[in-house]
C-alpha cells in the first residue's frame, strides 16, 4: 500500500470535524460562537483546504502508474450478509476529490463575504462543511451500501441548505420538494442495490463487477431481471442529477443561498448521479437495453432543459435549467458508451457552472440595495442590463463561463461537448440530431442571459419610477416580463415596482439582512463591483474554465498518454481515441460543425437582445399578418412551454399532489364514517345489550328499580300532558281527586 493512501480517510474527516465543532459551539455556546463567527468560517475553510492539498497527491500517484487501492473494515460481521466500510481510490475517485475540494474551498471563501450580514452565518458553514464531507465520503465509498448512506446524507444537507431561509414559504416548499423527489429516486436505488446483491452476492463495487461479467459470460443470469435491477439503480441518478421526469426539484432549489446553488449545481449533488453511473459503468455496459434507456433519458433531458431555459427571466433559474441540460449531455454520453467524454464534460462543466453561479451571486449582491431583497426583483434580468460597465471583473468572468457553455474554443466545455456531439452522431443520427439542436439552443439562451444582464442600458432605474417608458425586449423575442392583453394582442408593460429601501422586507423572512451589520455605502442608482473575497473565486475559477479543456484536446495528448488525466480516466473505455492521425487540420475540420451551430445560436441571440439590435420592438411589425399570426402563435407556445416549465409541474400537481390529497380525504371519510361507524355501532349495541342483560337477569333488586322507574316516568308524563285531564268527564274526578 502506498503510504499516502493510508491517510485518505482524512479527506472527508476534515470538513466533517469542522461541521461537528461548529455545530457543538453553536448549540452549547451560541453567544461566543456568534462573536467568533469569522474565526469559525476560517477554520472550516482551512480544514477543507487540508483535504484539497491531499487530493492532488492521490491524483499524482494515480497518473504515475500506481494501482487502484481499496481498504475496508468489517462493519456488521455476518456470515450471510457481511457489511464492510472502507474507501476505494482509482483515477475517477482522485479527480472527483480534486473537483469537490477545489470548488468547495472557493465557495467557502466566497460565502464569507456573501453571507456576512446573515444572522445564520455560522449555521450556514455548519451545513456547508457537512455537505462537502458527505460528498467526499460518497466519492471515496467502496461499496453500494456506503454510497447509499452518503447519498442520503447529501440529500439531507441539500434539504437544509435549500431551505436555509426557512421563514420564506417558497424556500420551505422548495426544500420539501427536493427532498421528496429525491426520495422517489433513492427508493428505486435501494431496490436496485438489493436486486444486484441478489444477482451477484456482493455489495463491493469491484467484486460485483467481476461476478456479473462471469454470470454474463456463462449465461447464468436472467437478462430481464438484470435490466430491471439496472433501471431501478439508475432511478437514483435520475433524481440526483435532475433527469426527466424527476427534474422538477432543480429550479426550485434556487431558493437557497447562491453559493449553495454553485456547489449543488457544479460539484456535489447533481454530480453525484453522474458519478454513480460512472462508478457502475462496468455493470451498465453489459446491458444494451439499459444503456439505450440511459441515452434516451439523457437526450430528452438535454433538450427539455434547453427549451425550458429559453424564456426564463430569473437569472438563477435560467442557469439551473442550463445545468439540467448539460447533465442530460453527460447521461447521453454514458448511455452511448462515451464514458470518457461524459466525465470530461462533468469536469469542464463543473468549473464553468461554478463560475457562472458565483458570478450571478455577485450580480444579485449588487442589485439588492437598488431594487430590494426580494428574489423576484434582485434576480430579475428585466431589471438588469449594462452591468459590465459597473462590474467589469464580474462581467468578464461571466462572459468566460458563457462562452464555455456555448461551446466556443478554447474554453473548457468546447472540447468535451464537441466529443459528445461527435460520438452521439456516430452512435445514432436521431440522438445526434437532438444533441446538435440542443447545442444551438444552449448557445442561444446562454448568450441571452449574458446580454440581458451585462449589455445594453441599466433598466432598474426605469422600473422603479424614474423612467416609465424604457423599451424592453418583446415577448415574441422570448423575453418574459409583465404582460397585459389589449384587443387580443399581447403587449408589454414596464413592471410597476415600488422603490424599496436598502433593507429587506419582513415578509421575506430570514433573508440576508444588512440591518444586523451596517453594509458598505453604495450608490442606490447603479450597482458596484463586489468586494475582494467575492471577486477572487471568480478569477480563480476563470483559469480552469479557460484552460482545463485543452488537457483533453486530441492534439495535446500525443506523447503524453500516461500523464494527462483524460487518457487514463478509465481503463476499460469502450472506444479508442486516435492520437497519431489527428493534427491541427483534423481538429479544425472536426470542430467546424459544432462551432457553426454555437455561432448561429449566439448570432440569433445578438440579433434579438444585442445593444445594437435593429429589430422592431414587436416582431409583428412589418410582417405579413397571416405569417405573423403563425409566428406569434409559435413564439407564444415556446414562451408558455418555458414559462410554465413544460407543464410538467402542473401535471404532477394535478395527478400526484391533488390526487393524493383527494385519495387521502376519501380514505379519511371512509375510515371515519364506515370503519369507525361499524365499530362504534357495534359498541353502542353492546352497551344497550349489556344494560338490558343487567336489568333482566332475575335479580329482585333490579326488578324493583325497573318498576319504580317505570311508574315515576309514567306519572311524570301524565302530569305534563294537560290534555289528558281535560278529556276526562267530571264524574270520574273522585277517582283521581278526593274532595271534601
Curated annotation (Swiss-Prot):
Molecular function (GO) terms listed?
NADH dehydrogenase (ubiquinone) activity; quinone binding
Membrane topology annotation:
Multi-pass membrane protein
Q: Which GO BP terms apply?
A: ATP synthesis coupled electron transport; electron transport coupled proton transport
Give the quaternary structure: NDH is composed of at least 16 different subunits, 5 of which are encoded in the nucleus.
Name the Enzyme Commission number(s) assigned to this protein.
7.1.1.-
Family matches, as NCBIfam families: NDH_I_L (TIGR01974), PRK06590.1 (NF005141)
- Top-level lineage group: Eukaryota
UniProt enzyme class:
translocase
Q: Which organism is it from?
A: Psilotum nudum
InterPro entries linked to this entry: NADH_UbQ_OxRdtase_chlpt_su5_C (IPR002128), NADHpl_OxRdtase_5_subgr (IPR018393), ND/Mrp_TM (IPR001750), NU5C-like (IPR003945), Proton_antipo_N (IPR001516)
Q: Which reaction does it catalyse?
A: a plastoquinone + NADH + (n+1) H(+)(in) = a plastoquinol + NAD(+) + n H(+)(out); a plastoquinone + NADPH + (n+1) H(+)(in) = a plastoquinol + NADP(+) + n H(+)(out)
Q: What does the UniProt function comment say about this protein?
A: NDH shuttles electrons from NAD(P)H:plastoquinone, via FMN and iron-sulfur (Fe-S) centers, to quinones in the photosynthetic chain and possibly in a chloroplast respiratory chain. The immediate electron acceptor for the enzyme in this species is believed to be plastoquinone. Couples the redox reaction to proton translocation, and thus conserves the redox energy in a proton gradient.
| A single GO cellular-component term on record | chloroplast thylakoid membrane
Assigned keywords, A-Z: Chloroplast, Membrane, NAD, NADP, Plastid, Plastoquinone, Quinone, Thylakoid, Translocase, Transmembrane, Transmembrane helix, Transport
Q: Which family does it belong to?
A: Belongs to the complex I subunit 5 family.
TM stretches of this protein: 9-29, 39-59, 87-107, 124-144, 147-167, 185-205, 219-239, 258-278, 291-311, 327-347, 354-374, 395-415, 425-445, 532-552, 584-604, 673-693, 705-725
Q: What does the UniProt entry say about where the protein is found?
A: Plastid, Chloroplast thylakoid membrane
Q: What is the recorded name of this protein?
A: NAD(P)H-quinone oxidoreductase subunit 5, chloroplastic
Amino acid at each position: 500500500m502506498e503510504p499516502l493512501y493510508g491517510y485518505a480517510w482524512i479527506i472527508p474527516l476534515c470538513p466533517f470535524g469542522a461541521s461537528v465543532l461548529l455545530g457543538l459551539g453553536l448549540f452549547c455556546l451560541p453567544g461566543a460562537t456568534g462573536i467568533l463567527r469569522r474565526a469559525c468560517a476560517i477554520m472550516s475553510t482551512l480544514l477543507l483546504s487540508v483535504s484539497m492539498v491531499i487530493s492532488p497527491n492521490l491524483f499524482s500517484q494515480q497518473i504515475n502508474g500506481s494501482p487502484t487501492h481499496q481498504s475496508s473494515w468489517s462493519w456488521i460481521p455476518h456470515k450471510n450478509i457481511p457489511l464492510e466500510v472502507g474507501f476505494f481510490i482509482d483515477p475517477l475517485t482522485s479527480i472527483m476529490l480534486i473537483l469537490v475540494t477545489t470548488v468547495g474551498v472557493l465557495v467557502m471563501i466566497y460565502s464569507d463575504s456573501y453571507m456576512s450580514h446573515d444572522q445564520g452565518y455560522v449555521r450556514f458553514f455548519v451545513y456547508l462543511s457537512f455537505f462537502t464531507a458527505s460528498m467526499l465520503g460518497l466519492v471515496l465509498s467502496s461499496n453500494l451500501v456506503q454510497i447509499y448512506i452518503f447519498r442520503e446524507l447529501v440529500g439531507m444537507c441539500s434539504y437544509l441548505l435549500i431551505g436555509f431561509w426557512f421563514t420564506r414559504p417558497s424556500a420551505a416548499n422548495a426544500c420539501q420538494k427536493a427532498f421528496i423527489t429525491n426520495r422517489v429516486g433513492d427508493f428505486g436505488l435501494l431496490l436496485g442495490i438489493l436486486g444486484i446483491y441478489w444477482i451477484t452476492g456482493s455489495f463491493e463495487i469491484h467484486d460485483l463487477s467481476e461476478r456479473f461479467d462471469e454470470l454474463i459470460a456463462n449465461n447464468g443470469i436472467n437478462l430481464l431481471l438484470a435490466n430491471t435491477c439496472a433501471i431501478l439503480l439508475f432511478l437514483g441518478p435520475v433524481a440526483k442529477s435532475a433527469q426527466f421526469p424527476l427534474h422538477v426539484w432543480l429550479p426550485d432549489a434556487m431558493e437557497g443561498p447562491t453559493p449553495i446553488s454553485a456547489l449543488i449545481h457544479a460539484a456535489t449533488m447533481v454530480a453525484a448521479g453522474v458519478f454513480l453511473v460512472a462508478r457502475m459503468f462496468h455493470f451498465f455496459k453489459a446491458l444494451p437495453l439499459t444503456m439505450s434507456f440511459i441515452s434516451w433519458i439523457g437526450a430528452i433531458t438535454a433538450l427539455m432543459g434547453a427549451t425550458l431555459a429559453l424564456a426564463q427571466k430569473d437569472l438563477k433559474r435560467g442557469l439551473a435549467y442550463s445545468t439540467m441540460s448539460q447533465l442530460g449531455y453527460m447521461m447521453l454520453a454514458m448511455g452511448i458508451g462515451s464514458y470518457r467524454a461524459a466525465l470530461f464534460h462533468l469536469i469542464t462543466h463543473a468549473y464553468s457552472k461554478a463560475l457562472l453561479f458565483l458570478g450571478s451571486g455577485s450580480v444579485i449582491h449588487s442589485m439588492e440595495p437598488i431594487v430590494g431583497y426580494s428574489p423576484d426583483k434582485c434576480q430579475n434580468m428585466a431589471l438588469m442590463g449594462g452591468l459590465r460597465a459597473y462590474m467589469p471583473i464580474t462581467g468578464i468572468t461571466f462572459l468566460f463561463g458563457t462562452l464555455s457553455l456555448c461551446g466556443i474554443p478554447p474554453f473548457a466545455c468546447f472540447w468535451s461537448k464537441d466529443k459528445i456531439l461527435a460520438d452521439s452522431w456516430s452512435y445514432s443520427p436521431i440522438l445526434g440530431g437532438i444533441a446538435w439542436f440542443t447545442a444551438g439552443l444552449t448557445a442561444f439562451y446562454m448568450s441571452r442571459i449574458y446580454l440581458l444582464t451585462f449589455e445594453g442600458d441599466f433598466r432598474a432605474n426605469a422600473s422603479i419610477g424614474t423612467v416609465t417608458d424604457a423599451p424592453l425586449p418583446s415577448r415574441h423575442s422570448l423575453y418574459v416580463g409583465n404582460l397585459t392583453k389589449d384587443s387580443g394582442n399581447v403587449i408589454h408593460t414596464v413592471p410597476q415596482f415600488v422603490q424599496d429601501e436598502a433593507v429587506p422586507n419582513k415578509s421575506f423572512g430570514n433573508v440576508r439582512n444588512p440591518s444586523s451589520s451596517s453594509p458598505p455605502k453604495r450608490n442606490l442608482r447603479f450597482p458596484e463591483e463586489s468586494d475582494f473575497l467575492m471577486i477572487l473565486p471568480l478569477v480563480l475559477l476563470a483559469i480552469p474554465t479557460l484552460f482545463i479543456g485543452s488537457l483533453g484536446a486530441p492534439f495535446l495528448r500525443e506523447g503524453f498518454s500516461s500523464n494527462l488525466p483524460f487518457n487514463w480516466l478509465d481503463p476499460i473505455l469502450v472506444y479508442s481515441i486516435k492520437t497519431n492521425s489527428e493534427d491541427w487540420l483534423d481538429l479544425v475540420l472536426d470542430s467546424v460543425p459544432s462551432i457553426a451551430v454555437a455561432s448561429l445560436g449566439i448570432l440569433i441571440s445578438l440579433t434579438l437582445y444585442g445593444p445594437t439590435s435593429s429589430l422592431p420592438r414587436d416582431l409583428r411589425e412589418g410582417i405579413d399578418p397571416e405569417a405573423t399570426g403563425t409566428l406569434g402563435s409559435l413564439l407564444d407556445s415556446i414562451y408558455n412551454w418555458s414559462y410554465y416549465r413544460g407543464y410538467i409541474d402542473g401535471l404532477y400537481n394535478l395527478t400526484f399532489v391533488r390526487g393524493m390529497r383527494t385519495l387521502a380525504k376519501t380514505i379519511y371519510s371512509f375510515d371515519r364514517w364506515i370503519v369507525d361507524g361499524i365499530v362504534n355501532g357495534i359498541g353502542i349495541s353492546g352497551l344497550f345489550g349489556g344494560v338490558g342483560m343487567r336489568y333482566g337477569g332475575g335479580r329482585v333488586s333490579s326488578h324493583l328499580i325497573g318498576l319504580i322507574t317505570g311508574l315515576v316516568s309514567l306519572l311524570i308524563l301524565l302530569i305534563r300532558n294537560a290534555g289528558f285531564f281535560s278529556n276526562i268527564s267530571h264524574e270520574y274526578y273522585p277517582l283521581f281527586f278526593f274532595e271534601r
